[in-house]
Regions:
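ABC ATP-binding cassette signature C-motif
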Residues: 1-169
Length: 169
């Protein structure tokens, strides 16, 4: 069977418990390898993934946990800003990658996401959050890198009705 998903489309999976929905999503997100068949996606496609059971760093703040979703981008920004021995080609490639991901606006995007998804304040310790608040932080974590593909496994777990409706839209 073939499944093709195009930009802007929403696809949902429905099936009984234990039939492999989560495993399929892990393969699509790139966190697991397929035993058979093949997955092809656009080269350089950034994927955001919120698994069914999402672990946050309880010792960190809300903001730190969300920023961790952009770790690769933050690494590129740091390398661009601190590396003195980059060739002009390497500098250009890093600049393009950062520009493409809108990396220079990461902090403003963080604030916008937190407001839109109604997360607790960025300096709040994660260990004090409810399940629904943690799920909102996890959603921001998946969205902060502006993924071209967003994979959500049981995205409405622990969310109130208002947030469930907002997520559906």
């Amino acid at each position: 069977a073939t499944l093709a998903v195009y930009p802007g489309e929403k696809v949902g999976l429905v099936g009984r418990n234990g039939c492999g929905k989560s495993t399929f999503l892990q393969i699509i997100a790139g966190t697991e390898e397929a035993d058979a068949g093949q997955i092809s996606r656009k080269q350089g496609l950034v994927t955001g993934y919120l698994p069914q059971e999402f672990e946050l760093n309880d010792a960190a703040t809300v903001g730190e946990n969300i920023r961790a979703g952009a770790a690769e981008l933050l690494g590129k920004i740091e390398r661009f800003e601190t590396a003195n021995n980059l060739s002009p080609v390497e500098q250009e490639q890093l600049q393009q990658a950062i520009d493409h991901a809108d990396g220079w606006n990461l902090e403003s995007r963080l604030k916008i996401l937190m407001r839109e998804i109604s997360t607790p304040p960025a300096d709040r310790q994660v260990s004090y959050l409810s399940g629904g608040e943690k799920r909102r932080v996890g959603l921001c974590h998946a969205l902060i890198s502006q993924p071209g593909l967003l994979v959500l496994d049981e995205p409405t777990n622990h969310l109130d009705m208002e947030m469930r409706q907002a997520l559906a839209n």
